[in-house]
Amino acid sequence: MASGNCTTPTTFILSGLTDNPGLQMPLFMVFLAIYTITLLTNLGLIALISVDLHLQTPMYIFLQNLSFTDAAYSTVITPKMLATFLEERKTISYVGCILQYFSFVLLTVTESLLLAVMAYDRYVAICKPLLYPSIMTKAVCWRLVESLYFLAFLNSLVHTSGLLKLSFCYSNVVNHFFCDISPLFQISSSSIAISELLVIISGSLFVMSSIIIILISYVFIILTVVMIRSKDGKYKAFSTCTSHLMAVSLFHGTVIFMYLRPVKLFSLDTDKIASLFYTVVIPMLNPLIYSWRNKEVKDALRRLTATTFGFIDSKAVQ
C-alpha cells in the first residue's frame, strides 16, 4: 500500500455535488425527501410481498429482492451524501471509502443480475407457460437469488482488490459525492493499468452478460407474443413486461452511458449527474414503476388494509 515514502491517507475529502453554499440546505432537503420515499416504498413493498400469500410467486420473490437491493443501494450512498451538505469538511475515512465502494459494486452487479433473472422469468412465463410451474419453483428461484448474490460478491472483491493496489501520495480530494472508481483513479499516484483492467473485465463480464440475457429473453418474448392471435392475449402478455422493461431501460441505459461512451465524452461533472440518477433516483422509482399499474400489488394492498382496519373491500377479496 505504500510507494517509497508515500503512505495511504487515513481520510479522503469528498467534493460533493456542489460547493455553492446557497444550495447545500435546499439539496439536503430534496435528497432527504427522496431517501425517505425510497426507504418507505421499498421496505413497504418487501413487507407487502412477505405477508400476502397471493404474491408468493417467482416474479414477486425477485421483485422483493430488487426492493431490498434498491433500499440497500440508496443507504450505501445517500446518508453520506446528506452529511456532506451539512459538513464544512466533507471527509470519509479510508476504510469507509473502501467499504462504500465495495458495497456500491456489490449492489450494482446484484441489481443488474436480478434484472436479467427477472427477464428470464418473464420468458418462461410467456414462452413456456405449461412448464412454468415446474421450471420456476420457489427452490429454483431462491437458488438463483443466492447464486447472483454470490457472483456479485466475488465481482466486488475483484473490483476492490484493484482499488487496494492504488497509492494516493499527492491528493486525497475525491471529485465526487461518493467513493467511485473513476475519481479515485484520477488522483492515484501509482499506475492504474492493472486495476483498470480488473475493473473493466470483471464489470463488463457481469453487466454485459446481464444485458445479453435480457435481450435474448425479450427477442423470444416478442416472437411469441406476435404469434398470439387475440388482442387481449397480446396486451396481457406485454403488460406483464412493461414495468420490467422500464426498470431495465433506466438502470442499464444509465450504466451504458456511464461506462461505454467514448473516452473523449467522459466528464466527472457529467458522471456525478448520471451517478446521482442510478444510485439515488432509480431506487426511488423502481417500486413506483412496479406498483403503479400492477393490479396484483394494488389488490394485495387492499387486502392488507381490509385486514388491518377490519372492513371488507369487495375488490380485495376477489
From Swiss-Prot:
Give the CC-aspect GO terms: plasma membrane
* Residues that span the membrane, as ranges: 27-49, 58-79, 101-120, 140-164, 206-226, 240-260, 272-292
The cross-references to Gene3D superfamilies, in alphabetical order and at most eight, read:
Rhodopsin 7-helix transmembrane proteins
Q: Name one GO molecular function term.
A: G protein-coupled receptor activity
Extracellular-side stretches of the chain, per the record, are 1-26, 80-100, 165-205, 261-271
Enumerate the Cytoplasmic topological stretches. Answer: 50-57, 121-139, 227-239, 293-318
Q: How does it sit in the membrane?
A: Multi-pass membrane protein
InterPro entries, A to Z = GPCR_Rhodpsn, GPCR_Rhodpsn_7TM, Olfact_rcpt
Q: Where is it chiefly localized?
A: membrane
Alphabetized, the UniProt keywords read:
Cell membrane, Disulfide bond, G-protein coupled receptor, Glycoprotein, Membrane, Olfaction, Receptor, Sensory transduction, Transducer, Transmembrane, Transmembrane helix
Q: Where in the cell is it found?
A: Cell membrane
Q: List the disulfide bonds.
A: 97-179
Describe the family membership recorded for this protein in Swiss-Prot or TrEMBL: Belongs to the G-protein coupled receptor 1 family.
**Listed name of the protein:** Olfactory receptor-like protein COR1
